[in-house]
């Protein structure tokens, strides 16, 4: 841990006097704070604490060679209700009894997220950071973050994006993945109206349209020397097409609210790619 970010630190409650060597750090108190110390140990093992450590350690830059426990222990802790303390104590006892992490991990993370009052969007940010971003930063180009997402993942992303678009009150939207080709994926957001969409007569934008604008740039998009993630936002009549590489890292559900804001901005400014010009 002291040389680079190998894994997340862990916290344990020790119910007796102890001394610590270099590499260990402790919070100590008398027996009157026994319950609170146990609860704090649970909080420090939660996804929120891991997110805090990942975001504050800044261990990916060349300027940092060592990590310190105090960065992890600096996590601000809000007041705990008696009910929350009881929930955390139950988790600590179950873990101390040797139960598998899978049996208590979800309850721990949910309880601590409630303690901090995280919104659903904020919880998704934490989840994406500890899965997709953590994998990406740790494993580089070999990370599963650069693999193609399954269809059900795009369905979840599309549902989140549609929710944020509808909340903008600029019409009701249908959102779906409409194309996956040439190493890209295209998410289409279409405003509902009284006229039914007709694929045979309505304009159809495709990933090929975008690529054909400048075929010479394709080599740079798929460079083997670095990771390139180009994207395009195309206004096409009543539809908006969001095009990115077909990689998990490019379609994190936690970014769907920002994507909705970018779509709204494009609608306001009227930056449009004309399909007829692209075809030419």
Question: At which residue positions do the language-model features occur?
Answer:
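Short, ligand-facing micro-motifs at secondary-structure edges
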Residues: 3-20, 38, 42, 49-63, ...
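Non-catalytic DNA-recognition/assembly elements of restriction-modification systems
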Residues: 78-280
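Extended hydrophobic-aromatic, low-complexity segments
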Residues: 9-13, 35-39, 51-55, 83-87, ...
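Active-site-proximal structural scaffolding
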Residues: 17-20, 33, 37, 68-70, ...
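Active-site proximal loops enriched in glycine and acidic residues that flank catalytic Cys/His/Asp
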Residues: 3-5, 28-31, 44, 76-79, ...
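Basic, amphipathic alpha-helical recognition segments used for DNA target recognition
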Residues: 22-74, 81-84, 251-280
């Amino acid at each position: 841990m002291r040389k680079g970010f190998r894994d997340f630190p862990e916290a344990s409650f020790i119910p007796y006097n102890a001394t610590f060597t270099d590499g260990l750090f402790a919070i100590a108190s008398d027996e009157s704070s026994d319950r609170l110390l146990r609860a704090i140990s649970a909080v420090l093992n939660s996804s929120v604490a891991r997110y805090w450590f990942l975001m504050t350690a800044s261990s990916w830059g060349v300027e940092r060679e060592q990590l310190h426990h105090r960065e992890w222990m600096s996590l601000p802790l809000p007041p705990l209700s008696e009910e929350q303390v009881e929930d955390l104590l139950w988790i600590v006892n179950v873990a101390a009894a040797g139960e598998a992490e899978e049996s208590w991990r979800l309850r721990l993370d949910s309880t601590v997220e409630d303690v901090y009052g995280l919104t659903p969007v904020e919880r998704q940010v934490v989840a994406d950071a500890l899965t997709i971003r953590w994998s990406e930063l740790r494993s580089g180009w070999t990370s599963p973050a650069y693999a193609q997402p399954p269809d059900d993942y795009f369905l979840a992303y599309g549902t989140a994006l549609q929710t944020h678009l509808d909340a903008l009150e600029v019409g009701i939207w249908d959102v779906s993945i409409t194309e996956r080709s040439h190493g890209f994926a295209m998410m289409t957001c279409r405003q509902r109206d009284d006229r039914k969409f007709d694929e045979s007569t309505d304009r159809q934008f495709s990933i090929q349209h975008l690529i054909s604008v400048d075929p010479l740039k394709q080599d740079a998009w798929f460079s083997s020397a670095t990771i390139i993630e180009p994207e395009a936002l195309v206004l096409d009549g009543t539809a908006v097409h969001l095009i990115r590489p077909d990689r998990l890292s490019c379609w994190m559900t936690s970014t769907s609210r920002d994507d909705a804001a970018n779509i709204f901005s494009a609608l306001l400014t009227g930056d449009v790619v004309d399909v007829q010009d692209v075809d030419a």
